[in-house]
Amino acid sequence: MLHAGLVSAPYITVDDTGARHARDSFHTTQIGAEHFTAFRTTASKSRLNFLSLLRGSYQDYVLNDAAFDYLDGRRADPALVAKIRSHEPRRFCDQVPFLEYLAGKGIDIFDRQAVRVLAEAGIWGSIRHHGLLGDTVIVSDDAGQFRVGNHALCWVYAERLLQKLMPATPRQVRQVEAVRDLVWRFYRALKSVKRKPPPGLAAAFRKRFARIFSLRTGYEDLDKLLARLSRRKDELLKVLERPDIPLHTNASENDLRSFVTKRKISGGTMSRDGRVARDTMLGLMKTCKKLGLSFWHYLGDRLGLDGQAIAPLAALVAAKA
């Protein structure tokens, strides 16, 4: 099901939350779109882990053009990249031959920082090799692990940063309120244009964005935040290029509520099977709801009970694309 979504969805929204497993702190990542939801609970919430989730059930590493573009984007050490660059793509069935190849090229495989970025590139190459995330936009908050591929930034998260400011004087309070008002007005205008984008308005929105986020108020924390958000202009205005994507990750937060409810009721998991079963069942439940199916009837069909036959969810997700 996740594979079908990653192949066919025009966008995905992602988020994560804490989880308990085997008396330890784990992290549950939500990956979803209009017609599917998947949960994956892992010990790490790194970018390497997130890319591994986006790779789906594949375990291979591929050093191709996409992998080297990734390394260029991450500003990897050119000397390191030169050691593994080749004219033809190289594919490795799993981590062991990949590390053997790196060692054979004179790379210290115990240098975790160097190997991590190379592994990220190899996984990203695998993702593109298998046709996943073709033109898919990844919409997320500002968590660093999610900033891969064609990324868009959640507007609601950006505005929350303004809420978190702690103005010390009445004048600073008024400045923050004025900027928040400008941002919400811009957001509402962007939302209305998104529904029916008229031609030629993208340039006007970019100019308006620049006017708002280039403001300098004299309140240092506010000015730094505006400058920071201004640097994320392309990610915040991605909707002008792709009006089919959402402006926020509210759907991800809604999906995660079911996980949080389950966590409050039954606590954590102890075994790997229990962890996978919980993630799988919650993902199936949310996907059935998005597809307009009864989860109860879906389970009955899979258990062989009499009733209406339901096609595989992966096929239904792909058909909705």
UniProtKB/Swiss-Prot annotation:
Keywords: Plasmid. It comes from the Bacteria. This is Uncharacterized protein y4jO.
